[in-house]
């Protein structure tokens, strides 16, 4: 995902749990804090700034649906509100993209996991990576 963004002219930097020392990650696992859901990447291109929560282990190859935890979506909505106008994007393993608000919109009257712990969104609802972040060819030509 980082390579795909860089190929489109974005400067990318890691953030979130993967950047913390093991003791901090362990402590976060034991809490319900929204910090557990902090975005994985921050990226800039020109004057544009975005944050990305990488969902690369969720390609939805079997069901044609993404399962996004309710905790993740709730934290994403809070993050988006606190850091507006900087968007937060969920980028999935198949490089398709949704925002927290879109997850809520597409699941308000639709498929929900029977436990209520996940929002299930059809992959066809997601945006193509190039539509959100630009194409690699356009970045090379610029």
Q: Which positions does each model-derived feature cover?
A:
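Short loop/turn segments at strand-loop or loop-helix junctions that form parts
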Residues: 16-18, 53-57, 94
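Mg2+/Mn2+-dependent nuclease catalytic core
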Residues: 57-80
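Glycine-rich, highly charged phosphate/nucleotide-binding loops
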Residues: 33-38
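Intrinsically disordered, low-complexity terminal regions enriched in charged/polar residues
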Residues: 100-142
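Short, flexible/disordered intra-domain loops and linkers
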Residues: 23-32, 60-68
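Nucleic-acid nuclease catalytic cores
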Residues: 77-110
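Conserved catalytic cores of phosphodiester-cleaving nucleases, focusing on short active-site segments
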Residues: 39-60
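Acidic-basic catalytic patches of nuclease active cores, encompassing PD-(D/E)XK
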Residues: 1-30
